[in-house]
Amino acid sequence: MRAFVVRARAAPVDSQQFLAAIGHEAHTEILAHTLMNTIFVAQSHRDDVVVYLVLESTQDFSRTICFRSNELGHIGGFHEQNLTNKIAKALTVSKGMAKEQLREVEAGITVRTVSFEKLIQELAEDYQLYMLEKKGTPVRDIEFAANPCFLLTDHIPMPKKSFNSLKRLGTQHINLGPKMLFASQCVVLIHNELDMRL
């Protein structure tokens, strides 16, 4: 099972604000692009992939939206607007939730009021964590664990205070090349690297 976590520090948890932020400073469209490239392939979708989108611009609790490729029903169309609407629907469902609650949105999609830090602690029990870092080990030199979990961010870098807690959880730093890429591009390269090893 491959897992991907996208930490979206500027993304609002209010569904209307989320949709209004597309193409603006928060760049919420990044989440749809990343989701598209993580789960879908030509004419189909990947098996055994889980994507966690952690939206952090909130007055109360972060929202973690989980997409499980094996459980997804008919998504309704392979385009940005449809995927942003799925995210917005999850945010609407999450309205009024207390801390660390879980709600099902539809088949294969859930939303939780859980922080990035708490989510990563949970995932570290079942996955080997990998974080993209320009000083990390080149991806072709990594021997990946059977259950890899890749940590990415939107256009706002991972805060320095997160590095120590990630280090304590055994997170390995990997490098995809000399250029800084969008999260949506990174997931394609990661999938390709893992696919070539099958």
From Swiss-Prot:
Q: Name one GO molecular function term.
A: S-adenosylmethionine-dependent methyltransferase activity
UniProt GO cellular component terms: cytoplasm
**SUPFAM superfamilies (alphabetical):** alpha/beta knot
EC assignment: the record states 2.1.1.-
Q: Name one GO biological process term.
A: tRNA methylation
Source domain of life: Bacteria
Location in the cell reads:
Cytoplasm
Q: For this UniProt entry, which segments traverse the membrane?
A: none
Q: Does the keyword Transferase apply?
A: yes
Report residues binding S-adenosyl-L-methionine: L132, C186
- Keywords linked to the UniProt accession: Cytoplasm, Methyltransferase, S-adenosyl-L-methionine, Transferase
InterPro entries associated with the record: Alpha/beta_knot_MTases, TrmY, tRNA_m1G_MTases_N
* S-adenosyl-L-methionine as UniProt keyword: yes
Report the family membership.
Belongs to the methyltransferase superfamily. TrmY family.
Q: What is this protein called?
A: Putative pseudouridine methyltransferase
